[in-house]
Amino acid sequence: MSGTLLAFDFGTKSIGVAIGQRITGTARPLTAIKAQDGTPDWTLIERLLKEWQPEAVIVGLPLNMDGTEQPLTARARKFANKIHGRFGAVVKLHDERLSTVEARAGLFEHGGFRALNKGSVDSASAVIILESFFEQGF
């Protein structure tokens, strides 16, 4: 196993992307992928999978604060299922509650308002999702 994991923060306009290593438990952002109503350019997803050859793909699961599902939850599940179906990748869903809030705070701290563009926030959220996945011992 490579120990490399790829994470996505699903969104209807932008999908954040991060790459991480299980051995170090760390992740870094990659360029976010634009989406049209939640549909990405699948050739970009395929390119990422071929380039990084992750042992698994982690997709953030958007839940309400009380743990219940919201409308975007089903769409994130569908996105995860499509990655598995199209590419045969091992896909795991991971709770992403507060990842965007944490990402915005971290980016603002380091770069002010200029750092808060949509793609940066989404990919920083993907980093938080992946590092949280590592912290929970997966």
From Swiss-Prot:
GO terms classed as biological process? rRNA 5'-end processing
Q: Tell me the enzyme class.
A: hydrolase
Name one cellular component (GO) term.
cytosol
State if Cytoplasm is listed as a keyword. yes
InterPro entries named among the record's database cross-references: RNaseH-like_sf (IPR012337), YqgF (IPR005227), YqgF/RNaseH-like_dom (IPR006641), YqgF/RNaseH-like_dom_sf (IPR037027)
Q: Which domain of life is it from?
A: Bacteria
Name of the protein described by the UniProt record: Putative pre-16S rRNA nuclease
- Stated role: Could be a nuclease involved in processing of the 5'-end of pre-16S rRNA.
Q: Chief subcellular site?
A: cytoplasm
Similarity comment: Belongs to the YqgF nuclease family.
A Pfam family in this protein?
RuvX
Q: What is its EC number?
A: 3.1.-.-
Q: Which CDD domains match?
A: YqgF
The record lists the lineage as: Bacteria, Pseudomonadati, Pseudomonadota, Gammaproteobacteria, Enterobacterales
Keyword Nuclease among UniProt keywords: yes
